[in-house]
């Protein structure tokens, strides 16, 4: 990104959070939650909450389109010209730039004491720690691996939420026979394919997929081959809709599920606002052109290993924020970061984000119904008990897995051949 374009973005999207601040802290991001309209419809809600919590800090935030952000980050981090605070995806992005980031452990210990980790969900802190250094803090969590269902549709056909693999097949096919899409999936998109595959793999044999990523076991492990086989079967046994490989998760699947055209999908906690709040659902109704009120519910993926329990969610920080090691005002930057991470959690809770910190409930004041409240409370319990992560550390493995899943879906590879492809990529990774 050239200098002119960066200044153009600054001129167009600069947001100053305080006119009386004593210290200026710069923050660059692609998903600047501190800039968002809050769940009460107030476009300045997060701004005002930040100013109230940090009256002596002026936060200068620049929000880039994602592609431009990645390009800008690559240049600024390596040249020491980055902003004081930067947003990161955990996994490969955070690992790539970890060496240019401040270790936040001393700041956390000073702020919250020696047991500061107890304040956070452990699954979040584990993923913002690289080579023993706390290089970022998780802002909110995205938990995936859930089966979202429309209870209204299931009730119409006297069906129950599937609790195991055979029931999943049966329910999907009964709905199909009645002209309703059972489980809809946007297999065109790799990101949701990863989510579904991780969910299947963890349900069959928890943690094996992470051991394979770490290089401790082969990707041809029996449980991973089995997971790949089940993934492939979904395209032929009636669980997935016809044409799944041509559908995107957004808007195709989201629209079909939300508007009552599909009874089930897999999705994550980021979907809460548009489904379970009056404000968000009214926006969905307006966008998708429907008026019906549905009962949406959430549970884990159906049992596939025969233990009688549904799958557990897995989670990663939706956004993590790090501090540049080259920042010239680190104490002020920490003050701003602390507010974004801790003090604004109640603001994020209004939008039904899962907190990165322990003991922060959803704000259910705008929930659409008691059924929605029950679903959200159940989801929060699952999220707090989440096992494992969403993001892969190594881009080589991620790319190979995406190709492998596509090849199995179209019948070009067997499950074993697909996992051999991923294992070959895994062996090239320098860990």
Language-model segments: which ranges?
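A structural signal for short loop-to-beta-strand junctions that line the ligand-binding cleft
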Residues: 84, 113-152, 182, 307-314, ...
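C-terminal lobe and pocket-closing loops
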Residues: 270-291, 302-403, 429-431
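Glycine-centered hinge/linker elements that transmit conformational signals in sensory
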Residues: 172-175, 214-245
């Amino acid at each position: 990104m050239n200098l002119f374009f960066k200044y153009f973005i600054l001129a167009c999207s600069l947001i100053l959070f305080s006119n009386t601040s004593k210290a200026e802290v710069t923050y660059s991001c692609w998903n600047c939650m501190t800039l968002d309209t809050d769940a009460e419809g107030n476009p300045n809600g997060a701004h005002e909450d930040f100013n109230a919590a940090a009256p002596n800090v002026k936060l200068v935030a620049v929000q880039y389109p994602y592609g431009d952000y990645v390009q800008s980050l690559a240049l600024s981090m390596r040249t020491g010209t980055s902003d004081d605070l930067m947003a990161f995806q955990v996994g490969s992005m955070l690992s790539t730039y970890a060496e240019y980031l401040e270790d936040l452990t001393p700041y956390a210990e000073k702020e919250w004491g020696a047991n500061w980790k107890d304040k956070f969900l452990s699954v979040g802190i584990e993923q913002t720690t690289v080579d023993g250094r706390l290089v970022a803090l998780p802002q909110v969590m995205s938990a995936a691996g859930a089966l979202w269902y429309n209870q209204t549709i299931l009730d119409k056909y006297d069906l129950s939420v599937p609790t195991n693999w055979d029931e999943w097949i049966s329910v999907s096919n009964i709905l199909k026979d009645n002209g309703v899409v059972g489980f809809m999936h946007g297999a065109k998109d790799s990101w949701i394919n990863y989510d579904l595959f991780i969910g299947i793999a963890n349900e069959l044999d928890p943690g094996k997929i992470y051991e394979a990523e770490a290089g401790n076991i082969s990707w041809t492990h029996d449980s991973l081959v089995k997971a790949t086989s089940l993934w492939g079967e979904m395209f032929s046994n009636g669980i997935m809709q016809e044409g799944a490989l041509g559908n995107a998760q957004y808007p195709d699947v989201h629209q079909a599920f939300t508007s009552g055209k599909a009874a089930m999908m897999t999705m994550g906690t980021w979907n809460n606002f548009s489904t379970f709040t009056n404000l968000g659902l009214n926006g969905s109704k307006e966008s998708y052109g429907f008026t019906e009120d549905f009962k949406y519910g959430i549970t884990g993926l159906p049992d596939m290993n025969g233990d009688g329990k549904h799958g557990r969610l897995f989670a990663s920080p939706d956004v993590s924020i790090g501090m540049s090691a080259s920042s010239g005002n680190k104490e002020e930057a920490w003050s701003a970061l602390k507010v974004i991470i801790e003090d604004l959690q109640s603001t994020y809770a209004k939008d039904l984000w899962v907190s990165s910190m322990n003991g922060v409930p959803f704000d259910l004041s705008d929930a659409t119904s008691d059924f929605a409240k029950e679903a959200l409370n159940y989801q929060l319990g699952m999220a707090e008990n989440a096992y494992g992560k969403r993001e892969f550390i190594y881009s080589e493995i991620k790319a190979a897995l995406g190709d492998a899943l596509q090849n199995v879906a179209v019948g070009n590879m067997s499950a074993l051949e697909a996992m051999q492809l991923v294992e070959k990529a895994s062996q090239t990774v320098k860990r």
